[in-house]
């Protein structure tokens, strides 16, 4: 790791501002940190202390940031003891966080990037879509999940490039970023198949 990259990594005590549970043991955690919100690049992650009883930090991708309010969001799924203890943290709790970590994504000259992510691969795609929303990159996002999505899919009011899918992630719709959803489950408005199958339909 270069000295420049080390200098951007901080150890910060972050307060839990919100902690929402979704079906499939999925959670969205909102933490306060002006420095992490300001310095995060899409595709980066943090190492987070989940409880005083477990010294080993857990790596979790950053899903979105709010620079104005100095906060950032993490999406995670309970898969073991560490994430189970993290899921028990309450609003007002303070967690030790190291980050942002990783190289992150660099924007390219591609006019219409296709961003594809499923499961734990969704947060980095949402993060880069957030960065692109105020540029001329005009991304199209495909998100997939085999458990219920960690948000309530809604009918998109944007143009539909994929006739077999009509629903989107509300946050991306709010950002005016085109998105469609894929799953092997029978969810309303969601393409039935893998994200790669939906990508072929789009292309």
Where are these regions (language model features)?
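Ferredoxin-reductase
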Residues: 2-91, 147
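FNR/FR-type flavoprotein reductase catalytic core
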Residues: 81-203
């Amino acid at each position: 790791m270069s000295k420049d990259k080390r200098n951007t990594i901080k150890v910060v005590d972050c307060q839990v501002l919100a902690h929402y549970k979704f079906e499939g043991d999925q959670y969205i955690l909102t933490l306060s940190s002006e420095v992490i919100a300001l310095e995060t690049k899409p595709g980066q992650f943090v190492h987070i202390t989940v409880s005083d009883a477990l010294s080993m930090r857990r790596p979790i991708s950053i899903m979105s940031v709010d620079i104005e309010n100095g906060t950032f969001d993490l999406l995670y799924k309970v898969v073991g003891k560490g994430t189970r203890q993290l899921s028990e943290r309450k609003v007002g709790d303070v967690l030790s966080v190291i980050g942002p970590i990783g190289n992150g994504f660099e924007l390219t000259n591609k006019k219409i990037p296709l961003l594809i992510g499923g499961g734990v691969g969704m947060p980095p795609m949402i993060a880069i879509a957030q960065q692109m929303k105020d540029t001329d990159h005009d991304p199209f996002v495909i998100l997939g999940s085999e458990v219920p999505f960690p948000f309530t899919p809604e009918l998109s009011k944007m143009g539909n490039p994929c006739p077999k899918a009509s629903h989107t992630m509300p946050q991306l719709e709010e950002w005016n970023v085109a998105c469609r959803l894929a799953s092997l489950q029978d969810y309303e408005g969601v393409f039935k198949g893998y994200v790669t199958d939906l990508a072929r339909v789009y292309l």
